Amino acid sequence: MYLEHLSLTDFRSYAQVDLKLGPGVTVLVGSNGIGKTNLMEAIGYLATLSSHRVSTDAPLLRFGTERALIRAKLVRGEQSTVIELEINAGRANRGRINRSNPVRARDILGICQTVLFAPEDLALVKGDPSNRRRFLDELLVSLVPRHAATRSDYDRVLKQRNALLKSARTGKFTAGHEATLDVWDQHMARAGAELLHARLELVERLRPHLNSAYAQLTDASKDAGAVYRSTIQGVLDDDGGPTDHGTEPSPSVDDLRLLSVDELTERYVQAFAASRKKELERGISLVGPHRDELELVLGQAPAKGYASHGETWSMCLSLRLASYYVMLDDARTGGTAPILILILDDVFAELDVHRRRKLAAIVAGAEQVLVTAAVDADIPEELAGRRVTVVPGGIDGEG
C-alpha cells in the first residue's frame, strides 16, 4: 500500500497544492522555508491526528482561514481508498472515507500509517519526559486506533481530578469534595491502568528492536535500552525525575507488566490513597501515566545528559526505526502487506556521512519512502529515486 496522491487546501502555507507520489523513494528538494515540511506534516497528521511540530491545530490553518483540508489517495493492489480530514477552527475536526458522510476524525486512524523522522526528534532524548510519553502514545494509536479513546478518556478524567485538587488548595475543599474525589479516583485508576498496560506491552516490544537498530547504525558500539518508570512503583520523584537507573527494568516494573488491567486499577487506587495528602497540598495529581518516564539508556548510563551529539542522534533514529519494525511485525502478523510510509524530513542534513549511509541503507527497501532536503547533495546515493522540486506555494516539477 502506498500514498498515490496528496491534496491540501488552506493547510499551513498552501492555499492549494497537489502532489503525485508512487512506491519506492521520492525526494522533495527545495530551499529551507519553502514548504517541504508542511507536506510531510500533513501526511503525518493523517496517521496520528497530531503534528510533530506544534501541540495545537491552530497553526495548521492558513492565516485568515477557518478550516484546512487534507485529502489522500492510498493504493493497495487494484484497490484504492480516499481519506479526507477537515481541520476546523473552534470545532471538532471531521473525517471522510471514500467520500462517505462525515465521521469522527479518529475513525480514519489506522488507514494511513507513517513513521516520521525529523530534526525535532532530538527532543525524544534531550527533552522532557512528555516527549517520550507522546512518542509511546502516538505509536499506540497507530498500532491500535482504539487507544486514541483510551488516552482521551484519561486526559478528561485527569483534568477533572486536577480541578478538584486545585479547589482544595484554595481552601474550598469540603467533605462533599472528598467523596467526589473518591469517585474520580476510581475513574482515573481504570483509565490510567488501561493506558499503562498498553504502554508496558509496547515498551517490551520496542526494546529488542531499539537495541538492534542502534547496533545497525553504530556497529554495536554500545547496547541501547529503554526502561519504563511508573509512578505507582515510587521510582520517580515528585518532580518526575527517576530516582534510580539501570539498563533492565527493575523487578517492580517488570512485575507490573504481568498484571492485568483490573490489578493495575487496584494498584492505582492504593497509590492515590497513599499520595492524597501530598496531592491536596500541591493541588495536582502526582500519580499516573501522565507523570511516568521512558528512560533511554546507552551502555550503563541514561542517554539524556550522557550521550554525545552523535550518540543522541543515533538513539533518536533507533527509536523511530524500532517503531517501524514493530509496525512491520503487526502488518505481517495480520496477514497483510506492510502499509507503512517512511518520512525523512530534513534529517540527512543533521547527520554525518557515516550515519547518513547507514540510515539510507536500512530504509531504502521500504515500500514507500519520502525524503525532503534543501539540496541534492544531502541525499545518500542509496536513496537515489524520483525527484520533486518544491517552490513557493506549490510543486514546480517532477522527475
From Swiss-Prot:
The keyword DNA damage applies. It is found in: Cytoplasm. Keywords: ATP-binding, Cytoplasm, DNA damage, DNA repair, DNA replication, DNA-binding, Nucleotide-binding, SOS response. Its main location: cytoplasm. GO terms for cellular component: cytoplasm. ATP binds at G30, S31, N32, G33, I34, G35, K36, T37. GO terms for biological process: DNA replication; DNA synthesis involved in DNA repair; double-strand break repair; SOS response. GO terms for molecular function: ATP binding; ATP hydrolysis activity; single-stranded DNA binding. The keyword DNA repair applies. It comes from the Bacteria. Belongs to the RecF family. The RecF protein is involved in DNA metabolism; it is required for DNA replication and normal SOS inducibility. RecF binds preferentially to single-stranded, linear DNA. It also seems to bind ATP. This is DNA replication and repair protein RecF. The gene is recF.
